[in-house]
From Swiss-Prot:
<dbReference type="GO" id="GO:0030145">
    <property type="term" value="F:manganese ion binding"/>
</dbReference>
<keyword id="KW-0378">Hydrolase</keyword>
<dbReference type="InterPro" id="IPR012337">
    <property type="entry name" value="RNaseH-like_sf"/>
</dbReference>
<dbReference type="InterPro" id="IPR004649">
    <property type="entry name" value="RNase_H2_suA"/>
</dbReference>
<keyword id="KW-0540">Nuclease</keyword>
<protein>
    <recommendedName>
        <fullName>Ribonuclease HII</fullName>
        <ecNumber>3.1.26.4</ecNumber>
    </recommendedName>
</protein>
<feature type="binding site">
    <location>
        <position position="8"/>
    </location>
    <ligand>
        <name>a divalent metal cation</name>
    </ligand>
</feature>
<keyword id="KW-0464">Manganese</keyword>
<feature type="binding site">
    <location>
        <position position="7"/>
    </location>
    <ligand>
        <name>a divalent metal cation</name>
    </ligand>
</feature>
<dbReference type="InterPro" id="IPR036397">
    <property type="entry name" value="RNaseH_sf"/>
</dbReference>
<dbReference type="InterPro" id="IPR020787">
    <property type="entry name" value="RNase_HII_arc"/>
</dbReference>
<keyword id="KW-0255">Endonuclease</keyword>
<comment type="similarity">
    <text>Belongs to the RNase HII family.</text>
</comment>
<feature type="binding site">
    <location>
        <position position="105"/>
    </location>
    <ligand>
        <name>a divalent metal cation</name>
    </ligand>
</feature>
<comment type="function">
    <text>Endonuclease that specifically degrades the RNA of RNA-DNA hybrids.</text>
</comment>
<dbReference type="GO" id="GO:0003723">
    <property type="term" value="F:RNA binding"/>
</dbReference>
<dbReference type="GO" id="GO:0043137">
    <property type="term" value="P:DNA replication, removal of RNA primer"/>
</dbReference>
Amino acid sequence: MMIAGIDEAGKGPVIGPMCIGGVKIDESKAHILKVLGVADSKKLTPKKREQLASQIKKHADGYFIFEVSPSQIDELRKIMSMNEIMVVCFAKVLEQLKPDIVYADAADVKAERFAENLLRQYAKTSPDHAKKIKVVSMHQADAIYPVVSAASIIAKVRRDELIEELKREWCIDFGSGYPSDPKTRGFLLKWGKEHGGDFPDIVRQSWQTVENIREELKKS
């Protein structure tokens, strides 16, 4: 029986893409993930995540990372909520893996609702398989199911790679990209002042952080 885990990295940042990772592995060898020391990606150092990502890809029966750019997120937010965006993105990963059982980290306050919505979305493109697949969604699934931890790790490593690429491309260290990061906020304030409140396409324009900074700049 094939099981899969799906998780995201970068849902909350104001800068950079979001990555949704999926890992598929035969249930009979899923214990390998525990042996590797797979754990919640947030609790691992970047170096350890990179090492594990390489091992995960080697042992997995399939994996896929779906990348969503800041501008794509902004466009989607015009017609749907962030929770709905997560459902669509998770379904994209599911389409690539087609396991017998999928464990998904719930991107909704109601985990069961997220599972139902994910299955409904998946059925739009894979109606036959949607009748057979079992969808399990839980909060903090990455801390419960090693296969979800594995998905979280490959997603986080890929997002970190993309963030470093952006820093090199723009020759700017904007920090982690999270609104709570002083370096990120400092970059946004400085850029906003220098460019009349306009921001580059690496920034999620629909984020409240950006709106707040624009309001601050108007007052000053």
